[in-house]
């Protein structure tokens, strides 16, 4: 469910409304007036919510009635499976794009409610210092003894823990920051993730309705970008250190005491377990897990899971010893062969 600290609810919408907005077809006309006022991932069904399935494969393993009270947009060939699960069904050849087209009619991110730089409802703890030009939104909460640098923007509902420091020009939206954190200049935290759907050759952006959760004692480097989750949260665990110019995509999950060197990037839903280390310019593919205490060397691309405690390098990344053996073999193959001397 979208956190009301960060999002205004605009619904409800009936299935008839959804069909008009998305171009989807209602499978059973008797459900046309059923309404939804929230959204949910398919694996976490909630009555009165809208969800989507890109194929019937995601539905076949669920028990009968599992989606009772949920409205689901799915491909036409998956309609019978969704009906078996008790869902009110809409069909579309591009369910993700249809779902995306409906979201702005159900929710919007909260805007700055007044013309004041600091909203009267914001709570600012004792001893906290604000630089020139700071903007603080409705319902935001800042702990004690914080330092908020010039021209920082703290969005509605955001929370910042005690003794945290924000350098100039930091932007926070849809985010909770722990205590004793250090966010360096130009970091942008909590903006929309890079969620894209395609329908009939046209791209559709997906409004993200999640948040960013950052634990205590975390450092975020200058000009880092951290996207909020699509449904849930993008997470960074306590005492992790993120270097300058890193990107963390929607729903990435970073554990505690993780180190990411500069220019590293995580794709959506990547998982970095506790005490892992990423060298400079490391890229981690979506849904890939870097195990506890694992290391990935600089300029590597982790396209598959890295087991706990191992050291991987290369593009694609692989265990260090294997990588070095392959390099040695390539060097051997690349050596010029001895030329046979010409005869007399």
UniProtKB/Swiss-Prot annotation:
Active-site feature positions: 250
Pfam families: Hexapep
Gene3D superfamilies: Hexapeptide repeat proteins, MurE/MurF, N-terminal domain
Functional pathway: Bacterial outer membrane biogenesis; LPS lipid A biosynthesis
GO molecular-function term, one example from the UniProt record: N-acyltransferase activity
EC nos: 2.3.1.191
GO CC annotation terms, alphabetical: membrane
Catalysed reactions listed for this entry: a UDP-3-O-[(3R)-3-hydroxyacyl]-alpha-D-glucosamine + a (3R)-hydroxyacyl-[ACP] = a UDP-2-N,3-O-bis[(3R)-3-hydroxyacyl]-alpha-D-glucosamine + holo-[ACP] + H(+)
Enzyme class: transferase
Keywords, in A-Z order: Acyltransferase, Lipid A biosynthesis, Lipid biosynthesis, Lipid metabolism, Repeat, Transferase
Gene Ontology biological-process entries: lipid A biosynthetic process
Family: Belongs to the transferase hexapeptide repeat family. LpxD subfamily.
Quaternary organization: Homotrimer.
NCBIfam families found in the cross-reference section: lipid_A_lpxD (TIGR01853), PRK00892.1 (NF002060)
Protein task: Catalyzes the N-acylation of UDP-3-O-acylglucosamine using 3-hydroxyacyl-ACP as the acyl donor. Is involved in the biosynthesis of lipid A, a phosphorylated glycolipid that anchors the lipopolysaccharide to the outer membrane of the cell.
Protein name as it appears in the record: UDP-3-O-acylglucosamine N-acyltransferase
Species for this entry: Maricaulis maris (strain MCS10) (Caulobacter maris)
Gene that encodes the chain: lpxD
């Amino acid at each position: 469910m979208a956190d009301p600290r960060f999002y205004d609810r605009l619904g409800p919408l009936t299935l008839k409304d959804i069909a008009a907005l998305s171009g989807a077809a209602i499978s059973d006309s008797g459900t046309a007036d059923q309404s939804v006022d929230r959204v949910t991932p398919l694996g976490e069904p909630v009555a009165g919510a809208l969800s989507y399935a890109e194929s019937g494969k995601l539905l076949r393993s669920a028990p009968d009635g599992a989606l009772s009270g949920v409205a689901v947009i799915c491909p036409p060939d998956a309609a019978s499976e969704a009906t078996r699960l008790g869902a009110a069904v809409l069909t579309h050849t591009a369910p993700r794009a249809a779902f995306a087209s409906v979201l702005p009619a159900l929710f919007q991110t909260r805007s700055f409610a007044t013309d004041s730089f600091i909203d009267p409802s914001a709570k600012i703890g004792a001893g906290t210092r604000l630089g020139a030009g700071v903007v603080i939104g409705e319902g935001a909460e800042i702990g004690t003894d914080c330092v908020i640098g010039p021209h920082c923007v703290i969005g509605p509902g955001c929370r910042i823990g005690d003794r945290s420091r924000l350098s100039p020009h930091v932007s926070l939206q849809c985010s909770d920051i722990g205590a004793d954190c250090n966010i360096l200049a130009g970091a942008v935290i909590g903006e929309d993730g890079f969620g894209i759907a395609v329908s009939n050759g046209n791209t559709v952006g997906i409004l993200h309705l999640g948040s960013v959760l950052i634990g205590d004692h975390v450092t975020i480097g200058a000009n880092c970008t951290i996207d909020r989750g699509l449904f849930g949260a993008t997470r960074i665990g306590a005492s992790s250190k993120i270097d300058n110019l890193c990107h963390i995509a929607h729903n990435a999950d970073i554990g505690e005491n993780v180190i990411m060197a500069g220019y590293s990037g995580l794709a959506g839903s990547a998982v970095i377990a506790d005490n892992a280390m990423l060298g400079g310019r490391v890229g981690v593919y979506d849904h890939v897990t870097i195990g506890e205490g694992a290391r990935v060397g600089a300029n590597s691309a982790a396209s598959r899971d890295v087991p706990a405690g191992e050291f991987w390098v290369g593009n694609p990344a692989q265990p260090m010893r294997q990588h070095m053996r392959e390099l040695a073999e390539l060097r051997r193959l690349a050596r010029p062969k001895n030329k046979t001397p010409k005869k007399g």
